[in-house]
Swiss-Prot record:
GO terms for biological process: keto-3-deoxy-D-manno-octulosonic acid biosynthetic process; protein homotetramerization. The lineage of its organism: Bacteria, Pseudomonadati, Pseudomonadota, Gammaproteobacteria, Enterobacterales. Homotetramer. Changing residue 88 to A: Shows 9.5% of residual activity compared to the wild-type. This is Arabinose 5-phosphate isomerase KdsD. The keyword Isomerase applies. Pfam families: CBS, SIS. Involved in the biosynthesis of 3-deoxy-D-manno-octulosonate (KDO), a unique 8-carbon sugar component of lipopolysaccharides (LPSs). KdsD is not essential in the KDO biosynthesis and can be substituted by GutQ. Catalyzes the reversible aldol-ketol isomerization between D-ribulose 5-phosphate (Ru5P) and D-arabinose 5-phosphate (A5P).
Length: 328
C-alpha cells in the first residue's frame, strides 16, 4: 500500500464509535439464535465423555483457540486443532467420545469440509458455527449454530469484525451456560488457574507458607524479657510465642507489646516474659485458606499470627509470607 496522507479533521473517535454501534446491533440480533439448537449443542457438550475439539481456519481459528481455552478453564475439557494439520495426522487426536465444534463464517471452509466425511465415519458429533444456515457445513452438522450478522463493521465488508465478535460471543454463551449447568465454582476455576492471583487466593493454605520447626520464635514462660527479645530478633518475625516443653501455647509477645512496656517506665532488666506477655493470643488453624488468615490479620491490625491445633503450636505466619506468596 502506498503512503497515504491523513485526511484533515479525520475523527478517529467517531470511526471507533461507529464500529461499536454496528457490532452492538449485530449482537442484539444474535439473541434469536439462542434457540433449540443452542440447547442441543449444550447437551452434546455436557454429556460428552471425551473432549470438545474446536476447529477453524484464519480468523475463525483465532476465535476457536480462545473458545477452546474458555471451555477448558470453565469445566468443559477442550482443545483446538488446526484443520490443515488435522488433515495430515492431527485428526488422530479426535475420538468418538469427543464432540467437534467447527467454525467458519461462510460455512464453506474447504479444509473443514474435507474432514467432515471422516468425522462422520468416526461417529463424532459435529457442531458447526457458521453465518450461513444453507452452507455445506450447516447442512452436514448434527447441530448448527447460526451467527449470521447484517454487516461487518469494516466499511469494505471484507475484514471479519462483526462476524468474529458474534462467533466469540456464541462461544462465551456456550461456555457460561455449561458452567452454570455443571455448578462450576470459583474453587473449580482456581484448580485450572493455580498460577494466577485467583488460584493463589483460593488454593493456598496457611500450612503451605507458615514457618515451622526451628523457624518458630518461642520461649518458655520462665524466660527473662531479655531472652525473649533475643528470640524475637533472631527469628525476625516481630514476635515470640510463650509455650511449654510440649509446645502448648501460654501467650504471645510482639514488638507492639515491647513498645507498651517501654511506655510503662519500668526497668525491663528485671522483668520476666510472664510479666508482660499477652495470655492466649490469636491463632489460626493450619488448613484454612491463606486469604482467610490475611483477612483476620488485617481486621485485627496484626502482622503475624500463631498457627495452632487448639493450644498446640504448629507454626507462625507473618504478613511478609503472604506478600511473598502473592496473596496480598
Amino acid at each position: 500500500m502506498s503512503h497515504v496522507e491523513l485526511q484533515p479533521g479525520f475523527d478517529f473517535q467517531q470511526a471507533g464509535k461507529e464500529v461499536l454501534a454496528i457490532e452492538r446491533e449485530c449482537l442484539a440480533e444474535l439473541d434469536q439464535y439462542i434457540n433449540q439448537n443452542f440447547t442441543l449443542a449444550c447437551e452434546k457438550m455436557f454429556w460428552c465423555k471425551g473432549k470438545v475439539v474446536v476447529m477453524g481456519m484464519g480468523k475463525s481459528g483465532h476465535i476457536g483457540r480462545k473458545m477452546a481455552a474458555t471451555f477448558a478453564s470453565t469445566g468443559t475439557p477442550s482443545f483446538f486443532v488446526h484443520p490443515g494439520e488435522a488433515a495430515h495426522g492431527d485428526l488422530g487426536m479426535v475420538t468418538p467420545q469427543d464432540v467437534v465444534i467447527a467454525i467458519s463464517n461462510s460455512g464453506e471452509s474447504s479444509e473443514i469440509t474435507a474432514l467432515i466425511p471422516v468425522l462422520k465415519r468416526l461417529h463424532v458429533p459435529l457442531i458447526c458455527i457458521t453465518g450461513r444456515p444453507e452452507s455445506s457445513m450447516a447442512r452436514a452438522a448434527d447441530v448448527h449454530l447460526c451467527v449470521k450478522v447484517a454487516k461487518e463493521a469494516c466499511p469494505l465488508g471484507l475484514a471479519p469484525t462483526s462476524s468474529t465478535t458474534a462467533t466469540l460471543v456464541m462461544g462465551d454463551a456456550l461456555a457460561v451456560a455449561l458452567l452454570k449447568a455443571r455448578g462450576f465454582t470459583a474453587e473449580d476455576f482456581a484448580l485450572s488457574h493455580p498460577g494466577g492471583a485467583l488460584g493463589r487466593k483460593l488454593l493456598l493454605r496457611v500450612n503451605d507458607i507458615m514457618h515451622t520447626g526451628d523457624e518458630i520464635p518461642h520461649v518458655k514462660k520462665t524466660a527473662s524479657l531479655r531472652d525473649a527479645l533475643l528470640e524475637v530478633t533472631r527469628k525476625n518475625l516481630g514476635m515470640t510465642v510463650i509455650c511449654d516443653d510440649n509446645m502448648m501455647i501460654e501467650g504471645i509477645f510482639t514488638d507492639g507489646d515491647l513498645r507498651r512496656v517501654f511506655d510503662m517506665g519500668v526497668d525491663v532488666r528485671q522483668l520476666s516474659i510472664a510479666d508482660v506477655m499477652t495470655p492466649g493470643g490469636i491463632r489460626v488453624r493450619p488448613g484454612i485458606l491463606a486469604v482467610e488468615a490475611l483477612n483476620l490479620m488485617q481486621s485485627r491490625h496484626i502482622t503475624s499470627v500463631m498457627v495452632a491445633d487448639g493450644d498446640h503450636l504448629l507454626g507462625v505466619l507473618h504478613m511478609h509470607d503472604l506478600l511473598r506468596a502473592g496473596v496480598v
